[in-house]
Amino acid sequence: MNQSKRILRTVYLSLFLIGLFMLINDIFSSWMLGSKSSDKELQFDLNKSFDDNKMLLSKSNNFNLIDKAQDIIVETGIYFATFSTFRGNLVSLKLKNHLNLEKDPTDLINVDYKNEPFFDVSFDYLVEDLFLYKKIDDFNHEFKAYFKNNGKTYEYVKKYTFSKKNEYLMRFEVIVNGLEDYNLLDIDSYKITFSSQIERLSDKAKLQYNNYLSQIIYYDNKLKYGKDDLRINNPKWIGSSTKYFEVLVSKENMEVEFKKEKGILKSFIVNNVINKKNISDKFFIYAGPKDNRYLDIFDKNSDNTFGLSDIAFGMSVEKSLWYLIQVPMQMVMQVFYDVIPNWGLSIIFLTIVVRILIFPLTFKGFRATAELSKLQPKMKELQVKFKHDPKKLNEEMGRLYKEEGVNPLGGCFPIILQLPIFFALYSLVNNLFLLRGANFIPGWIDDLSIGDSVYHFGYKLYFVSWTDIRILPFIMMFTQLGSTIVSSNIDLKNLGAQQKFLYFGMPIMFFFILYNMPSGLLIYWITTNIFTILQQYYIKMHLS
């Protein structure tokens, strides 16, 4: 095997593993993708408290105090919450501080509330009339209704409590009183259908954010994904999760089951009511960024408004195989950001620091390659001499390597050892929530979590799934080619047609693979390529 082929195979083996890693990551993300109403409007005083006695009397006379559905909008420091008097449900929950591509607040509970509400409680179907609303204060909101069975009227209340500290958490309570002689239609439990679409994105947004929706559950100290017919007793929490946001639900002593209905996986919370005179169940709902800065505060009761502890919401953030490498990398990025508040520059500086740290490995690999190249004349002589005897050729080659003290794989190992660092950086830059919406170069790279854009088509190109003209992928391709040429030290004139195809085809292949990747990832890749070119020139000068 001549020197150029060996170097090419080493480089392409590394690139193949990188491509395989990204392909598996993309497939895994895609895999996870997995009544009564009134259209009349109502105008009434939302701040007026309801009269329980008057309401109860009106129910007994089958008269509706409120016979028209009403949306009630509540604003907190972090949410725009919309409730409906139809079943007293939360129908929209928008994050004020996190905008989507259309520059609108991200909606975490974007559902068809009349047909598929966010928290669909079994009792809702027993209520014939609309719920009455009462604002306790800015953080506490109550909905009340009554339902009848066997001539008796039962009080049914839903309470919503928001955090006073602008935490991404709310408490939801289900209260049913007067069950001493009522067995809830001979059932021993009631169900809540948990449904959260977490922002029904436009086709552009789905492609840009590489978005997926997965049903997740945490039990036995493990993060699992929901599947059909799965039933779990007393998990820590269940939830719906995307790349950057999630809605998680926690309750003591709950049972959860997953069922596929019309091809859609749904989750159900089963609540026991055996021997209960009254029902008073509390659910804690996290609805916000998929970011440990906001999730981990619920593991210590002194850190959050509701006094929760050991909820383990932070375990919803998937940990990659390279997590231990990613942690110090993110810390270094944060240090750079604190000095210069620009995440794009932080990525560049982090990349340079990493490349400097692994320079000894790079230098060792290049030196091994240089030592091997000195043997080319002797290797060619052996190849000519034993061209009809491959077995003898291998024996003589081995003897030559041993006599000269050269390891033919010496240039491969340093490259392979660097791959975990690349994978860790790739995973960090591709998934870090802090990069969502982070501006690097205004007017060009406005969001490091999606691809850059200089022109938007308004439609998707069929064969390549392109929606925009992007500049970074072209820069990446040319710098990748330059990096490969400099690193390989190959005379292009001596390459065969097949080798030239592989030589130029690999950067082109990665151009298509990475075209729609987050711009933050491409900035890392381009910085690596440029640093490699400069580094290889320095090494060549040093060795010469």
From Swiss-Prot:
Predominant place of localization: membrane
Location of the protein in the cell: Cell inner membrane
GO BP annotations listed: protein insertion into membrane; protein transport
GO cellular component: plasma membrane
Keywords, sorted A to Z: Cell inner membrane, Cell membrane, Chaperone, Membrane, Protein transport, Transmembrane, Transmembrane helix, Transport
Presence of keyword Transmembrane helix: yes
GO molecular function: membrane insertase activity
Presence of keyword Glycoprotein: no
Membrane topology: Multi-pass membrane protein
Superkingdom of source: Bacteria
Membrane-crossing segments per the record: 13-33, 321-341, 343-363, 409-429, 461-481, 506-526
Family, as annotated: Belongs to the OXA1/ALB3/YidC family. Type 1 subfamily.
Function: Required for the insertion and/or proper folding and/or complex formation of integral membrane proteins into the membrane. Involved in integration of membrane proteins that insert both dependently and independently of the Sec translocase complex, as well as at least some lipoproteins. Aids folding of multispanning membrane proteins.
Assembly, per entry: Interacts with the Sec translocase complex via SecD. Specifically interacts with transmembrane segments of nascent integral membrane proteins during membrane integration.
Protein name, entry field: Membrane protein insertase YidC
Species of provenance: Borreliella afzelii (strain PKo)
Name of the encoding gene: yidC
